[in-house]
Design a protein with these regions (language model features):
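Carbohydrate-interacting regions of secretory-pathway proteins
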Residues: 1-140
Length: 140
């Protein structure tokens, strides 16, 4: 989940039996892990490390629109807030009861709001033939 909530635009939450790898700092005690594009990929999965804070808060001031971009291509994903990459993710998958990982390569997009008012405008979906060059280096 690409969280859309005031104060937490771009955070990640695992849903159901999902798992994913995110460039993030290692956990420190009970503190949540924080995304950082210069860190190695670390696994997040339901029931364990299931939440990751975005790298920084790039939200717009109150009463201004915040632009959100979610780029997904070939097992790689980016959470972008107002033009700033706040999370680098790869290998989204779900885990079967027998422990087998199944890649998530397609599915549905859901926009939602939990316990807070949110407005959407200019929602667009664009097919990609490749990961935009400016972001490809984040996966090296």
């Amino acid at each position: 989940e690409f969280q859309i909530m005031e104060g937490h635009m771009g955070d990640f939450w695992c849903q159901s039996t999902s798992a994913i790898d995110i460039r993030s700092y290692p956990a420190e005690g009970v503190m949540n892990r924080v995304a950082n594009a210069k860190q190695p990929f670390r696994t997040f999965r339901s029931g364990q490390e299931y939440f990751c804070l975005r790298s920084e808060n790039y939200e717009s001031p109150d009463n201004e629109w915040t632009r959100l971009d979610l780029i997904c291509f070939d097992g790689k994903s980016l959470h972008i807030v107002n033009g700033h990459v706040v999370m680098v993710l790869k290998d989204s998958r779900y885990i079967l009861p027998d422990g087998k990982a199944v890649p998530m390569k397609s599915g549905k997009i859901q926009l939602q709001s939990e316990a807070a008012e949110v407005f959407y405008r200019d929602v667009r979906i664009k097919a990609l033939t490749e990961l935009p060059e400016e972001y490809a280096r984040l996966f090296d």
